[in-house]
């Protein structure tokens, strides 16, 4: 068994629509073609062992099935003018509820920073960060994600 303590982290996700490098924040909206939700699954027990040894966390964050992306919605630049609300229910209980206005870096700043180090390519996804409420999952749990009140996904952990 790879991990006995996997946690969910709901995040806003933006899909890149054209190739870009060294993108200024003021132009970032021109590189986004859609947005939606994603779940970043983390093996906390694996992460703790790696942290103790001062090692990188990629084994805890980048394993098979460690990311899920919802249906994506068309993006318009005006969406960045106001906070984007998103939430996650686990087994019908609200566990995460947040909005883009609570993020330390907004999506334009994220794109500017990431594009300094990596060429962004058409189809790349940028996960933005997670609101409070991260927690463990178990086989059979049902996760439902909503964006601006619209349900974008429902998945059962297997």
Which functions belong to the PLM regions below?
Residues 1-121, 125, 133-158:
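Catalytic-core "active-site belt" of small-molecule-metabolizing enzymes
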């Amino acid at each position: 068994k790879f991990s006995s303590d996997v946690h969910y982290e709901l995040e806003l996700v933006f899909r890149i629509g054209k190739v870009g490098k060294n993108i200024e924040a003021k132009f970032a909206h021109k590189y986004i073609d859609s947005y939606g939700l994603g779940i970043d699954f983390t093996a906390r027990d694996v992460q703790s062992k790696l942290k103790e040894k001062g090692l990188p966390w990629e084994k805890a964050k980048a394993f098979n099935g460690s990311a899920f992306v919802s249906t994506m919605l068309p993006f318009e630049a005006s969406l960045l003018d106001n906070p984007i609300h998103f939430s996650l229910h686990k087994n019908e209980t609200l566990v995460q509820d947040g909005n883009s206005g609570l993020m330390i870096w907004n999506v334009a700043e994220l794109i500017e920073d990431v594009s300094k180090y990596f060429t962004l390519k058409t189809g790349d996804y940028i996960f933005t960060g997670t609101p409070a409420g991260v927690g463990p999952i178990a086989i059979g749990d049902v996760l439902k994600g909503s964006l601006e009140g619209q349900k974008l996904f429902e998945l059962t952990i297997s």
